[in-house]
A protein has these predicted regions:
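Intrinsically disordered, low-complexity segments enriched in small/polar residues
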Residues: 1-144
Length: 144
């Protein structure tokens, strides 16, 4: 299983199995705080979506992925993740913005669908299963 380590404000966060299937986001303690599933073949695209860790903190996670079948791309450009600054969680339900777009090719874009997420409810962070809907071009989490 491949692992890619990134940092957020100096804190390491690991992303496992990012070549396809389930993507596990882990904190520095090795605890999985978000799981995402890639459906179909990942194209050369960029994703930007919101994740919440087990402490109820929210982050934007940006992903640039490219399948190995694309020839001529540097190896380091394949499956590159980075995390930007934490944002204020002002909504009870967590949104995933559909802000991915084609960078190099005109292929059909395949989004990453969440399998689990963490949601704060009355000060308690709960693990919720996959129940999402699209509203105004954004993913919305349903209630836990």
């Amino acid at each position: 299983m491949k692992a890619l380590n990134v940092t957020l404000d100096g804190r390491p966060i690991s992303i496992y199995n990012y070549t396809g299937g389930i993507i596990h986001l882990q904190n520095k303690k090795g605890e999985t705080f978000c799981e995402l599933e890639s459906l179909g073949t990942t194209r050369w695209i960029q994703h930007s979506f919101l994740v919440m860790d087990m402490n109820g903190e929210s982050y934007y996670l940006n992903q640039i992925t490219a399948p190995d079948s694309i020839e001529g791309l540097p190896e380091e450009t394949n499956n590159f993740f980075y995390i930007v600054n934490p944002i204020y969680d002002y909504q009870k339900e967590l949104e995933i913005g559909l802000t991915y777009y084609n960078i190099k090719r005109q292929d059909i874009l395949i989004p990453l669908y969440p399998t689990h997420h963490y949601q704060k409810d009355k000060g308690v962070v709960k693990k919720c299963s996959t129940l999402c809907h699209i509203h105004k071009y954004k993913w919305h989490w349903d209630e836990c």
